[in-house]
C-alpha cells in the first residue's frame, strides 16, 4: 500500500485539505494574530518564517481553527509543535487501511476507537481524527504538563469532551502496559516515536534544521528551543528502532484487543529490523504505507495478529 505520487503540493494524501498553498487571507480572517508573521519571499509569495516557533504555532492555530473548527489551541513553550499537513496524512492513510477490511468503505463515527501513544501537549492526532472522521481516542503521554494542556484543548472544544479521554503513563519504561486494560478494544494504535537515541543527537539535528531554514541567522546556542520538544518527544534510549522494537514486543500481549497496531517510521534503514521483529512475534499481517511531504519521506508500518477473517469480522 503506497502513497500516490502527484504533482500537487508535497505529494500529500488526496483527501488532505492542505494540498494547495496556504490561503493566508482566509487564515488571517479566522486568526488575525497570524498577520504579524506573514512576509513576502524572494519569489513574491506570502509565507511565514518556519524557523520562528511562535510563527509556526500561530499558523497551526489558524489552520486548526479554519479547517477543523478547533478553538483556542495552544501549547506551552518548548513543547513539540507539529506540522498539520503531515499529521493529517497519517490519519487519512489510517482511514484507507481500515477501509480495506470494511468493504472499501472508510469507517466513521465514535465506534472507531484509536489509541494515541505520546499525544504530546498538542493533542494533534485525536483532534484531526475526530474532526475529519468523528473517531474516538484514548490519548496518552508520560508528561503531566502535556496531559494538562491537552485537557485544556478538550475543555475549549465541546465536541472533543466525549470523544477523547486522556491517560498519563506513570511508568515511562512501558508503552501499552497500564494503558490497555482487559476490557479495552481498539481499532488502531498510532504513534510518532522519538527519533533520536540521545539528547546530543537531537540537538545536532535541530541545529541543522534551523540552519537549513534560515542560513543567514547566527548559530543558535539553544536550537531545541526553536523547534520545541521535551526529551521524550525527541529521543529515547535506543532511538526510533529501540522504541518501535519494544512496542512490537509489548503488542503481543494485546493481540486480540487491537485490530491494527501502527507507528510512523522516519528512518528507512530501520525497516529491515522492524520486519524481522514482527516475524519473530508472528504478526499475521504487516503493511508499509509510504508517505511524502515535501522533501521528507516517511512511512507507516502497521501490523495485526488477526487473520483475514477476523479482520473482516471486526465490528466498527
UniProtKB/Swiss-Prot annotation:
The keyword Methyltransferase applies. Residues 204-214 have a biased composition (Polar residues). Its EC number is 2.1.1.181. Keywords: Cytoplasm, Methyltransferase, rRNA processing, S-adenosyl-L-methionine, Transferase. Pfam families: Methyltransf_10. GO terms for molecular function: 23S rRNA (adenine(1618)-N(6))-methyltransferase activity. It comes from the Bacteria. It is found in: Cytoplasm. Its main location: cytoplasm. PANTHER family: RNA N6-ADENOSINE-METHYLTRANSFERASE METTL16, SAM-DEPENDENT METHYLTRANSFERASE. Specifically methylates the adenine in position 1618 of 23S rRNA. Belongs to the methyltransferase superfamily. METTL16/RlmF family. This is Ribosomal RNA large subunit methyltransferase F. The gene is rlmF.
